[in-house]
């Protein structure tokens, strides 16, 4: 048996080990396409600001091709360094693209005010064609839809401080898009707006240079569909992190935004470690968790072997990311989610609608937190020198502070209330009759009358007065209402009616085991 266990441990380690590179053959290269990246050909701030202005307009042009859009974005991303060309050549190692650098200088003979640096060759026409200034119609179209403040006609400046503020504002909006461009592009707008408000309050960006939503959507879509662009951005982040000493302000801002980018798409793996293992509850000793604990141990070793690119494996489309999916350890993940929703309110809004989600182990995690509330770890107490009297005091305080948290209903609640189909009577309330039915109708009537007399906000207070005092608020519903102001009143009304019904059902007692089925179509609107 000992030999079998050793073989099993060795098998688990080798199973999740990444392939070993060998020198039997050369690197596999794909069919490359050329990306032209314009960079400043001199150290003039006017040249850089004019190039930034033309590239922002170019990205806002809907007729721009994908490779040209990628080149324009790489040019903007590298404008904050002293030598953009050296930076691009140093960090670029992409098997799918071949980058060509074009130095840009000022010109009074071109419509764009820029030309490509060359030895004795007139390149004004080519520069105008690249920056879409050869067609007056496209030139006029490119002036709209890039800044929300339509009074800004251009962003050409002469002083370095003003240029850095404008460039930092534009770069912040581009880098924020990376966090959810791959994992959750449909829900990215809210988080991006929160980041923008944060950096505006910190004076890291200038609010007047907020870019149009259409422009940001174009950039987000390009980041999502172009792996080469994401490879460049990740390589730039890693290069900034390796830089010793003080970094430029824009570089520090990029590192700050990286905290939202790092480990994107790895929430299941990270949260399972945080709530399932680091909490060290006794439930980890269950036999059901033995296999998944060894799997998670192998994945943690694999994560470390991948090096500095491991947190970006989803953004870089690394095929090994599938091993870190929660489907590889479903029981431990379900247990960790139960622990998480009890310990942190922010976990209540997570989506648990997975095919491998196990409600039994989810409830196990919840019960472990509830029954372990106020207990002090003897091992940690001995290491910290905590006496038995101090441990009892801590337990007593913790029990009082967690009573309110334990009494709240947190987590998925899909099975608590069942709604009838449309072919059933709207006013029918099964297992409610006589006195209870009249009380429901009375509470609804008083709520509607209060709404007519006092308005939406005061009517909500009036309805709240008829609720049982012991009925807790739905945290998940409240958070969703705060995120959608247009539906907040309707959601609050539905929540109050639902709580009124729940309060009535609690007064019935425990005579029946069949759950009550309510029918209120207003709750489904």
Swiss-Prot record:
Nuclear export signal (motif): residue ranges: 425-440
Binding locations of RNA: 180, 195, 202, 260, 351
Entry keyword Amino-acid biosynthesis: no
GO MF annotation list: RNA binding; structural molecule activity
Keyword Phosphoprotein belongs to the record: yes
Post-translational modification: Phosphorylation at Thr-279 is required for the formation of the nucleocapsid.
Compartments reported by the entry: Virion; Host cytoplasm; Host nucleus
One GO cellular component term noted in the UniProt record for this chain: host cell cytoplasm
Region (Homomultimerization): 1-36, 373-391
Residue segments, region RNA packaging and organization of the helical nucleocapsid: 1-375
Alphabetically ordered keywords of this record: Capsid protein, Helical capsid protein, Host cytoplasm, Host nucleus, Host-virus interaction, Phosphoprotein, Ribonucleoprotein, RNA-binding, Viral nucleoprotein, Virion
Residue segments, region Disordered: 418-525
Biased composition regions of type Basic and acidic residues, renumbered to the chain: 433-452
Main location: virion
Region ranges (Interaction with the phosphoprotein): 477-505
Renumbered ranges of motif Nuclear localization signal: 70-77
PTM sites of type Phosphothreonine: 279
Region described as Ncore: spans on this chain: 1-403
Entry text on domains: Ncore is globular and carries regions required for N self-assembly and RNA-binding. Ntail is an intrinsically disordered monomeric domain in the C-terminus.
Function: Forms the helical nucleocapsid (NC) in a ratio of 1 N per 6 ribonucleotides, protecting the genome from nucleases. The nucleocapsid (NC) has a helical structure with either 12.35 or 11.64 N per turn, approximately 20 nm in diameter, with a hollow central cavity approximately 5 nm in diameter. The encapsidated genomic RNA serves as template for transcription and replication; encapsidation by N is coupled to RNA synthesis. Forms the encapsidation complex with the phosphoprotein protein P. Before encapsidation, the newly synthesized free N protein, so-called N0, is chaperoned by P.
Family: Belongs to the paramyxoviruses nucleocapsid family.
The protein's assembly and partners: Homomultimer; forms the nucleocapsid. Binds to viral genomic RNA. N0 interacts (via Ncore) with the phosphoprotein (via N-terminus); this interaction allows P to chaperon N0 to avoid N polymerization and non-specific RNA binding before encapsidation. Interacts (via the Ntail) as N-RNA template with the phosphoprotein (via C-terminus XD); this interaction maintains the P/L complex anchored to the nucleocapsid template during the sequential transcription.
Protein name per UniProt: Nucleoprotein
Species of origin: Measles virus (strain Halle) (MeV)
Gene this chain is encoded by: N
